[in-house]
A protein has these predicted regions:
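Extracellular beta-rich repeat passengers
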Residues: 2-181
Length: 181
């Protein structure tokens, strides 16, 4: 799933009076609960924009104060389960009660989003389809937050709990609390 928003309405909506003055990249999101991605390059990607010519503008934040909750989703055997591009310092998105299993990279946040009350499994026994060692969390641009999550299998020899790689701008103070093992 790719949440990519234009700054202004695109055709055919751009020609309709109903959408005059609308700014899709600042509008509240609707519900997105109980969704699943399996065997994808990216399970969920947020914080990109579209230009009026339909070209992709990377790291364009969804500029709404939120909070918005992605509830009860499952991400299995993806290259990357959850990815959020640079979204400013807003803490406007919470990934709540998710199940992440057998992904190569579980969580890559270039923003201040929160993963809460979720279960993150390194290897369910079914293996990831890409055959690579799993990484739970990239210490990326962030700083993301992990709150009250349950971890399974991250003590295995092939599993990586953290990957300390920053990108364009590395914000310190990623926060982790309430983990159970």
């Amino acid at each position: 799933y790719w949440f990519i928003f234009p700054a202004t309405p695109l055709e055919p909506a751009a020609s309709l009076p109903y959408y005059a003055g609308a700014q899709p990249s600042t509008e509240p999101l609707g519900k997105f609960d109980r969704n699943t991605a399996h065997s994808c390059m990216s399970g969920l990607d947020i914080n990109d924009k579209l230009s009026s010519s339909h070209s992709i503008l990377g790291n364009g934040s969804w500029d709404n104060n939120g909070p918005f909750y992605f509830n009860d989703c499952a991400w299995f055997s993806n290259d990357t389960a959850l990815y959020a591009g640079i979204g400013g310092r807003k803490q406007n998105v919470v990934y709540y009660n998710h199940t992440l299993a057998d992904n190569i990279d579980c969580i890559i946040l270039a923003t201040y989003h929160t993963v809460e009350q979720s279960m993150i499994i390194a290897d369910s026994g079914h293996g990831n389809l890409l055959g690579a060692a799993p990484t739970m969390y990239w210490i990326y641009d962030g700083a993301g937050q992990m709150v009250d999550n349950h971890m399974i299998g991250w003590d295995a020899d092939h599993a990586n709990l953290f990957h300390p790689l920053g990108a364009a701008t590395k914000h310190p103070n990623h926060r982790f609390s309430g983990f159970t093992w």
